[in-house]
Amino acid sequence: MAKESYKRDKPHVNIGTIGHVDHGKTTLTAAITLVLSKQGLAQERDFGSIDKAPEERERGITISTAHVEYQTDKRHYAHIDCPGHADYIKNMITGAAQMDGAILVVAATDGPMPQTREHILLARQVNVPSLVVFLNKVDIADPELIELVELELRELLSQYDFPGDDIPIIKGSALKAMEGDAEGEKAILELMDAVDAFIPDPVRDVDKPFLMPVEDVFSISGRGTVGTGRIERGRIKLNEEVEIVGLRPTRKSVVTGIEMFQKLLDEGQAGDNAGLLLRGVDKTELERGMVIAKPGTIKPHTKFKAEVYILKKEEGGRHTPFFNGYRPQFYFRTTDVTGSVTLPEGVEMVMPGDNLAIEVELLAPIAMDEGLRFAIREGGRTVGAGSVTKINE
């Protein structure tokens, strides 16, 4: 059977289910596929197939993630669901599964629990732009309790700078929907309407300002210096001005040639592996770890705050804790830079398996924005992962 071609007739959005263990994230994911499959908009996936999520490696970290796809009348969705709490933390911090929005699942019988809070905080820290809430198990909860849980949730969301008063909270039962109950199914359709309406269309990478990390550098005799890499975002056209940012003082240049697979192009765009010929740049002035970007859109920094996850020993991480002043390498995009770590007040040491907020000072400046992901390495071995939450300098 020939492969079906991917139709781009609807906006594509990446979402996922987040929330406390056993509140019904995977059951809800299965229920969405079941209900939408009845309209021909999804292939039904049972709980077991989602729960046995395959392992993936992202920035040297093994994460179990299930990928499910479905459509509504308005959009095409790629939906991720993780079996374990640690998988969520790793997923959100490494950006392995970038989410444009998330469905926060809360059991009405329990209300917000520690992981509910932690997932909301992480969603805020790693820039998940918006949340919709599914209040699950309402069929077995006391109606008065449901109202209290809703109030508590709105307060909790507001506490972490989400619009708690405006976020849609859909009440339902994922299990009832799985059993084919009409009320149960109606709640799932309501949830998908809320997701369609409340989670904004993502800005496509192509429409963002141009940026390409430099992976390799070579010179063409008589023509100049070429930087190669995969274009991360935006587009670049011939004779456009660019800035070279990171490691050394920022400098300007002009792109006089764009090459891809040995062919010359007029334009390169996000996702392309390209070589850019740069006017007036010496081979010694360009190196791996710099970025070539649209002027004025990104600056080099050395000091930042980050949310990090430190690998357990079983995951190939450190066997021992580390302390204030720890100096590993931070791997940004294409290169390692040494940096020193300041722990939050009151934290004496960090154990393998912990996730926490730290401050970092790098030895050399790197082009960065808030939300940039990195790996923490020691001698080429990954011992952690992180996301820049605030730039200090």
UniProtKB/Swiss-Prot annotation:
It is found in: Cytoplasm. Gene3D superfamilies: P-loop containing nucleotide triphosphate hydrolases, Translation factors. Residues 173-175 are annotated as: G5. GO terms for molecular function: GTP binding; GTPase activity; translation elongation factor activity. Residues 136-139 are annotated as: G4. It comes from the Bacteria. Disulfide bonds: none annotated. CDD domains: EF_Tu, EFTU_II, EFTU_III. Keywords: Cytoplasm, Elongation factor, GTP-binding, Hydrolase, Magnesium, Metal-binding, Nucleotide-binding, Protein biosynthesis. GTP binds at residues 19-26, 81-85, 136-139. InterPro entries: EF-Tu_GTP-bd, EF-Tu_GTPase, EFTu-like_2, EFTU_2, G_TR_CS, P-loop_NTPase, Small_GTP-bd, T_Tr_GTP-bd_dom. Residues 60-64 are annotated as: G2. GTP hydrolase that promotes the GTP-dependent binding of aminoacyl-tRNA to the A-site of ribosomes during protein biosynthesis. Monomer. Belongs to the TRAFAC class translation factor GTPase superfamily. Classic translation factor GTPase family. EF-Tu/EF-1A subfamily. NCBIfam families: EF-Tu, PRK00049.1, PRK12735.1, PRK12736.1, small_GTP. This is Elongation factor Tu. The lineage of its organism: Bacteria, Pseudomonadati, Chlorobiota, Chlorobiia, Chlorobiales. The gene is tuf.
